[in-house]
């Protein structure tokens, strides 16, 4: 059992839970999770397996007044930190509420639910950003957290850039960042600063709009994301930005201003990118003309199949082609409505 001292760990009621044990941070992350770690302490394995077989555990933090949400912790298999009143009983239905007071301004309410398969604990806190950082400090100390994923909605009263800087200044890597607020429009400087704080994330989703005329350095853009990049208002993304993402696995650009000619040039460049990691490209393109996009390239017609609500269906003739890179890697080029899709085999 872990019993952190008050001199090394911020004051927080979590350490009062009797079966809290520390282990290494699991590297694999899934979107919308803040911390992923494993609880495998020998002294709790037998008890937990008896109570919850193959159970996942998830804790979520919601700062409701700012529409800010961060979730942390999903444990596959055994669970060991649900608290005395939960772990001391064998029951098919586990519900409970705990309230911890962190300081004069911050209270944390934990609500436990067990639906027979998954036990979830939801943490509700006041809107102060500092409260989130206090929880981060605590869990970083207890679990030696190295990576975090965050999700938040842009708010004029909320300084997202300062929050992201504060997280990184704690020696924690921003792994997945989800920035919601589809109808929010940011000034160019604010949008740029936000992007700059997220350049080395594995996954990034940016929903807010930025004013027309916004420009962003291609050299900075090339560092974005090893896994997934999604930009909802991508009118500012040029074909040079797209080409620079050779090491990002999947790119989705909505409301883009890329043209058929741009994509023709991009495919020519991609066919020369030996060793590039880029696997999937999904672009919203106005007046999409696939024959113009593949004009002058070496291609073969391919039968395209897509899945939808009605099951699988074939794409119309001329809406799916196959191209090959110089290193032998093949990719399928297709269109669905106004969406251009490239999928590497």
Swiss-Prot record:
Domain F-box: 11-55
Keywords for the protein's UniProt record, in alphabetical order: Developmental protein
Top-level taxonomic group: Eukaryota
GO biological process: embryo development ending in birth or egg hatching
InterPro entries: F-box-assoc_dom_typ2, F-box_dom
Classification via PROSITE patterns: FBOX
Purpose: May have a role in embryogenesis.
Name of this chain's protein: Skn-1 dependent zygotic transcript 15 protein
Organism ancestry: Eukaryota, Metazoa, Ecdysozoa, Nematoda, Chromadorea
Chain's gene name: sdz-15
